[in-house]
């Protein structure tokens, strides 16, 4: 294309910075607070006062007395219930069923076992204090914790002062072994650069190499000289094209 196609001094060039029209943003995805209305208003914008109409309160209804639900007994007077006698009619009591005495066929003497025959006495040795522990609910002497009466920490009792003997101190006493004190070698020598002017220090860095291409290059074995480009070939196409409409005549109808 020649230079005649361009008009003026403008030529296509790469933009200096990103252009917003070239990128697809999320659009109205962010839910920002509105600037209209009173509720959920943007706090960074001024908001005008809003007025509402309140609801009408119902009128208070006064009652003069109890309604039909207040039932007053008929025998109730100003001074209480009247003293007229009242009688009630109870139902007829039900007759009790007669006692059915068992006949001779209800007894089985053969099942009595040793109860009907003489047998030697048998005794059972029960454990000690049988039935006493189950009925006793009071705590024993071991349930109470009595404070000790020995020592200075007795509650409600006067006690004499007590003294305690502590162990000997290894440092500062008269029997301290002074040969175990630290010598001059135990202290670390402070560097003179801390309290004096420090000389400049230099470091030797490693040798830097020029930037170069470190990608892997194919060697001689990567090329196969026996492979050649295949020559051009021909193929037989279909008789009718799929993109051509069939011929329809009046005789076909």
UniProtKB/Swiss-Prot annotation:
S-S pairs: none
Keyword line: Cell projection, Cilium, Flagellum
Placement of STPGR repeats on the sequence: 182-207
Protein localization: Cell projection, Cilium, Flagellum
GO CC terms, sorted: cytoskeleton; motile cilium
Keyword Nucleus: no
InterPro entries (alphabetical): CIMAP, SHIPPO-rpt
Source domain of life: Eukaryota
Family: Belongs to the CIMAP family.
Protein name: Ciliary microtubule associated protein 1B
Origin organism lineage: Eukaryota, Metazoa, Chordata, Craniata, Vertebrata
């Amino acid at each position: 294309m020649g230079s005649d196609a361009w008009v003026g001094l403008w030529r296509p060039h790469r933009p200096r910075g990103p252009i917003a029209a070239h990128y697809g943003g999320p659009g109205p995805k962010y839910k920002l607070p509105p600037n209209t209305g009173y509720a959920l208003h943007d706090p960074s914008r001024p908001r005008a006062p809003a007025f509402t109409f309140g609801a009408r309160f119902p009128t208070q209804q006064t009652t003069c007395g109890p309604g039909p639900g207040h039932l007053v007994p008929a025998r109730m007077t100003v001074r209480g219930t009247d003293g007229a006698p009242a009688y009630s009619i109870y139902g007829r009591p039900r007759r009790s069923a007669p006692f059915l005495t068992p006949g001779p066929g209800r007894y089985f003497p053969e099942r009595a076992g040793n109860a009907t025959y003489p047998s030697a006495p048998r005794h059972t040795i029960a454990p000690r204090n049988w039935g006493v522990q189950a009925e006793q609910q009071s705590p024993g002497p071991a349930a109470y914790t009595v404070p000790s009466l020995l020592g200075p920490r007795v509650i409600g009792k006067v006690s004499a002062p007590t003294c305690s003997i502590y162990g000997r101190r290894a440092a500062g006493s008269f029997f301290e072994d002074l040969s175990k004190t630290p010598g001059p070698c135990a202290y670390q020598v402070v560097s003179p650069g801390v309290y004096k002017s420090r000389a400049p220090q230099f470091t030797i860095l490693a040798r830097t190499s020029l930037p170069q291409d470190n990608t892997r290059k194919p060697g001689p074995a990567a090329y196969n000289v026996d492979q050649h480009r295949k020559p051009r070939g021909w193929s037989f196409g279909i008789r009718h094209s799929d993109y051509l409409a069939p011929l329809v005549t009046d005789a076909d109808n």
